[in-house]
Amino acid sequence: MTRTELLCDHPALQRHWYAVARSADLAREPVGVTLLGRDYVAWRDGDAAVVAAPDRCPHREAPLSLGRLLEGDLEGAYHGWRFGRGGRCVLVPSAADGVPVPPKAHLGIVHAAERYGLVWLCPGEPTAGIPEIAYDADPRYRRLNVDVERWQASATRMTDNFLDISHFPFVHTGTFGRAQDTHVPRIELGPLDDGYYGYSYEVAVNNDALGATASGLAAKVLTRRMTTGFHLPFAVRSTIHYETGLDHILLLLSTPVDDVTSLFTFVVWRNDDFTVPLAHRSSHDWV
């Protein structure tokens, strides 16, 4: 059995978008990523647009992610072939003057986009867009991006965890749950907005010092109104509403590297005090 045949080889997964890196990670060098068991290289072309292609040079299949960027062109590390906008080969250094670039020298690019401070790839023809977060266009909210991490867990297992609320009293007693409240609250499943499907519920949480900093409330116990929604294939949006009017919106993203390994990142939107610099808050303050 391979490390992709249980999940990643399913053809339907090729037609969805996956977050593979932060936009800030694509600055001066190409970046290699593995998605659904296949290796890709992503870089910025001369227009600063994100381009992605299989991570192998069509000449001798050396990884293009080992190359470098020259004036927006990706130069291979092995023989110096250069690829410009749209993955087209623009230079074969060993060829004599006047010799045209052969058509097979061009890269077969995949769909690439930037949204929410992240780089997204879709290996096949997209059947749907990148998950919508309307708050991203709302000037009352600001966004925080964190690092993209590599986890030894399947994307399905991670998504299951993000949707599960029965572990809150045991794992998240300082943020999402209380040790003394182990019963799962009554929830109703149904379609939410923007293509998400999920549920809403209320949860009591102990308002410790960290929670008081995040919520702006001094009460020892708070009631949070939470809405959690799933978006195909591995995206979860969780909205936390406080009685003060403060909202936290989390977009939790699992990207399958293979059947047992995933990339994980999350994005947070908040409508709190803009006079407090983001650098003065730890990532834990956002949740």
Question: Where are the language model's segments positioned?
Answer:
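Rieske [2Fe-2S] iron-sulfur-binding domain
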Residues: 2-12, 19-143
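A generic structural signal for short, non-catalytic loop/turn and secondary-structure boundary residues
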Residues: 12-13, 26, 35, 105, ...
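Short non-domain terminal segments
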Residues: 16, 81, 166-168
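C-terminal catalytic domain of Rieske-type non-heme iron oxygenases
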Residues: 49, 127-287
